[in-house]
Amino acid sequence: MQLFYNPTITETTEVFSFDKDESRHIIKVLRKKDTDILHVTNGLGFLFTTEITLASDSKCTVKILSFEKAAPSKFRLHLAVAPTKMNDRYEWFLEKATEIGIHEITPIICDHSERKIINTERFDKILLTAMKQSNELFLPKLNNAIT
């Protein structure tokens, strides 16, 4: 199952459009057509089953057919981890934390940390990609770094 993400949809939404990049990916790369079924999440535990109503290169509009809400975990898992010198190791950690269902991640800058600057935009994209690839319905919250 391919999972797509749109943070603006709610239980009351009936029709919505993907942004230009996501629309291009759906129509050009995945070659989806009108009446194809897509699964979309808003990162808050909802899984929406949708049908494509308009498929063009720059705009993909879908109609929500049904939705389900995943039961939240009994426990909230919050990890606070210092970024490593090699950025790819921290990115790998973010992917795995998302896949196992961590709810919140806080980078910690310690006295002897070799990495003092955190690229939160890049890390947010990694969390989003990991959520979609692992079919996870909850997007972890990435907090600002603390010292």
Each PLM stretch: what is its role?
Residues 71-147:
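RNA substrate-binding interface of SAM-dependent RNA methyltransferases
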Residues 1-70, 121:
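N-terminal positively charged helical leader segments and presequences
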